């Protein structure tokens, strides 16, 4: 059976997903698209899915009889309503981050899915599908380095545009660490603090950059995450886990080591999409396979809620300078499997 998918949102990410669904992945095809900009929808159809029907309203796309599953890649504030509508129609839905723009919105989705009785939602956190992070988790879970005590992490971008704001360091950037570190350790956070080093001259006047986020988990693991979105030299993701008996480090992407003209060098990526391109393929294939098996296993609506609660606390900490509590509701048994 080929899974028939409708895509809501045909911007850069949406078109990239349409491309991989039609040209790279197996077991699915795009039969419907929608975008607030009709030209974007037409472009997606022209370039990647010539047989797909264009819908003027995303709700009509969700209700369409030939749409068996939905991808939501539209503007963030629209996600909650589309996901809730997909659940109401009993259709599996893959939603790019954020699941909703507030923790309360994420909880409404959780409650709707609980009421439905089966998992329908997968959130687009792709780092758990990265082979480097998977290898790191295997080491942690094996007990080889003992219990994790500390994590030292960094999320560095070459540069960001003028529209990037201080709180986006949390909601657009750190949100990936908030999800993947929770997954690595298998536990929730209890507090967050944000401190500001000396500001780089490369940051716009309204942006605090870099920032350091300090997190504590339920068991007492301490995490520091450097966010530096105008580092100039490239796109660089680091994660070092300090355990009782050793240290495990996220591997850098493979690159050719060059010795030339009395210098030794290794190229560093500059594009975040290039760094995790394989992970996007794996996560979406996992969604397709999960829908066909009627068993979704990827990041859940609860994971989206947990990341949103932690992000809200980090934004509060940006403003207060204090250690802010992270109060996550008790996880339902539905999401513990």
UniProtKB/Swiss-Prot annotation:
Q: Does the keyword Ubl conjugation apply?
A: no
Matching InterPro entries: Gfo-Idh-MocA_inositol_DH, Gfo/Idh/MocA-like_OxRdtase_C, Gfo/Idh/MocA-like_OxRdtase_N, MI/DCI_dehydrogenase, NAD(P)-bd_dom_sf
Q: What are the UniProt keywords, alphabetically?
A: NAD, Oxidoreductase
Q: Name one GO biological process term.
A: inositol catabolic process
Highest taxon of the lineage: Bacteria
| Annotated catalysed reactions | myo-inositol + NAD(+) = scyllo-inosose + NADH + H(+)
The record's EC number reads 1.1.1.18
Q: How is this protein organized at the quaternary level?
A: Homotetramer.
Q: Which HAMAP family match?
A: IolG
Q: Can you name this protein?
A: Inositol 2-dehydrogenase
- Species assigned in the record: Burkholderia multivorans (strain ATCC 17616 / 249)
Name the gene for this chain: iolG
